[in-house]
Structure formats: structure tokens, C-alpha cells
């Protein structure tokens, strides 16, 4: 059974509001180079390079090679990285608003995720501005499911199954 938990607006580009007009920026991302998020970030960096006629070059550091996933937000806030990509739901312990898109079954399609992102954007922008950050864009995460080595047809089939989750909201399931 592949139960769709919800669509997660996950990848965020952040930049420090106080970033200076540098010509070279480092952009850590926790995802491997072949992940679609990193491929999008790599395209973003190429688009910035083209739009600025090479005056701003963003070096993408994939796979947590510059900062681990849980260190990226603080690195941008502290100016160690000029821009970074994070999984917003991973910061729901700081503020519940960060976990809105992690609420299971709240948005179960890309269309619903887009509506949710638009609805929460003003509040997120305000919260992030207070932290010295600005969300540049968000990317929907594909619908989530339960992956198991054996078929899951009833609740009893889950007995003894080990789980991994990426946020407090999904851990509750």
C-alpha cells in the first residue's frame, strides 16, 4: 500500500537579509547532487549567473558537504553561508508555522500544496524576516508514502515495522 501522507512544500532557498553584494556565494544543500531538489538549485545558480552576467556566482555544495541539514539555517543566519536550502518542517520545534506543510493529509496533491504555500507565505515571510531571513522560493515535495518490504493491507500489518520520519508531525503517525 502506498498511502499518500501529503505533499510537502519542502525545499527553501534562504538568503540573509544583510548579505553584502558579494560576487561568490556558497549554497549548502542537504540533498545529493542527483536529487531533484539539488538539480533545481543547480539550475537556479546557473540562472542567477546568467541574469547577473556572471557578477554573482553561486557554488552549490550538495549532500551536506558544507553544512549538515540541521546546520544550514543557522549558517545562513550567522553569515557563514550566504544562501542555503532547508527542509522547513525540520524547524517546527522553533515555531509551529514551520511545520504547517508537514501536517499529514493536509495537502495531498501538488495543487493543494500550491494553495497551502500561498496561504502560509505572508505569515512565513513575516516570521523569517524577524529571524533575518528571506524565503526566495519553495518547491513541492512529491506525495509521501509508506514504503515497506511486505504488503500493508491492514493496521495489524504494521506491527513490528520500524519507521523513519523527517519531522515531528510525521513521527506522530
Regions found by a protein language model. Give the residues of each.
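Gram-negative bacterial Sec-dependent N-terminal signal peptides
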Residues: 1-21
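Immediate post-signal peptide segment of exported/extracytoplasmic ligand-binding proteins
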Residues: 19-29, 49-57, 129, 151-162
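Extracytoplasmic "Venus flytrap"
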Residues: 26-43, 63-68
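Short, polar/charged alpha-helical segment
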Residues: 34-59, 119, 123, 172-173
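Contiguous mixed-secondary-structure segments that line small-molecule binding/active-site clefts
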Residues: 45-46, 82, 87-173
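Alpha-to-beta junction loops
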Residues: 53-57, 72-86, 161-164
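General small-molecule cofactor/ligand-binding pocket signal
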Residues: 59-61, 136
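Short helix-initiation/N-cap motifs at beta->coil->alpha
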Residues: 61-74, 166-169
Amino acid at each position: 500500500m502506498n498511502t499518500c501522507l501529503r505533499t510537502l512544500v519542502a525545499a527553501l532557498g534562504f538568503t540573509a537579509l544583510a548579505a553584502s553584494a558579494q560576487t561568490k556565494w556558497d549554497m549548502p544543500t542537504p540533498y545529493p547532487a542527483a536529487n531533484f531538489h539539488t538539480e533545481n538549485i543547480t539550475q537556479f545558480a546557473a540562472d542567477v549567473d546568467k541574469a547577473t552576467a556572471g557578477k554573482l556566482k553561486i557554488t552549490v555544495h550538495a549532500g551536506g558537504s558544507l553544512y549538515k541539514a540541521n546546520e544550514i539555517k543557522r549558517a545562513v543566519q550567522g553569515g557563514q553561508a550566504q544562501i542555503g536550502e532547508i527542509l522547513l518542517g525540520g524547524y517546527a520545534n522553533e515555531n509551529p508555522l514551520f511545520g504547517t506543510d508537514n501536517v499529514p493529509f493536509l495537502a495531498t496533491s501538488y495543487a493543494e500544496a500550491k494553495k497551502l504555500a500561498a496561504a502560509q507565505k505572508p505569515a512565513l515571510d513575516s516570521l523569517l524576516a524577524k529571524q533575518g531571513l528571506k524565503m526566495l522560493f519553495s518547491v513541492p515535495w512529491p506525495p509521501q508514502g509508506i514504503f515497506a518490504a511486505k504488503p500493508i493491507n491492514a493496521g495489524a500489518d504494521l506491527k513490528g515495522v520500524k519507521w523513519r520520519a523527517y519531522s515531528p508531525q510525521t513521527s506522530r503517525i
